[in-house]
Amino acid sequence: PVSFIFQYKEIFVDKIYIFNTDRKQPVIYDCGSNVGTSIVYFRKLYKNARIVGFEADKNIANICRSNLKNNNAENVEIIDKAVWINNDNIEFNEHGADGGSIHGSGNKKIVESIRLKEYLDNEPYIDFLKIDIEGAEYEVLLDCKDSLNNIENIFIEYHSWVNDSQKLSSILNILETNGFRYYLESLTKKDSPFLSKTTKSTMDLQVNIFGYRI
């Protein structure tokens, strides 16, 4: 599918997730693992890393596990629950191969959730935290805002939904408050932006945020 080709290009060709580390066993949290493309990449580069992946859609999580096995990317913990602000479950829209979201339309169902903050608080150091959770990133980051000091690198895929207020500045403020510098790349291309303020799409902006310490 097109989504996989895009994933592969971003991860293996553009190398958006590569980072430097001197640690023998870096810790990587992959929130929104999808079919496991990013984890295969992490395992290839950081052979001794401790990797924890989260994927809310149990069917996709099983595909992820199979892909990891087929690519010799083993010794990875995959948690098939949604990354959220509590452990009380959440309504989730399944979108097939593209994963799912708490926003938009799709096959709605209740899925199990975990509170990411609790995981972060139990880790003395995290080398890389990836958050690509299709629209839940603001709520999760807000809940984790006092638990980011032990993180060296953070990647966030920000999604702006037409029917909701934009939260990009709030996310950047959380990063600034926690001592991160950041770099942004927009994945949204609009011709004549002032003439295309309304959109039929449920999403009107998507930005990759790279947070790091120097």
Task: Label the model's feature ranges.
Residues 1-214:
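Phosphate/nucleotide-binding beta-alpha loop and adjacent structural elements of enzyme active sites
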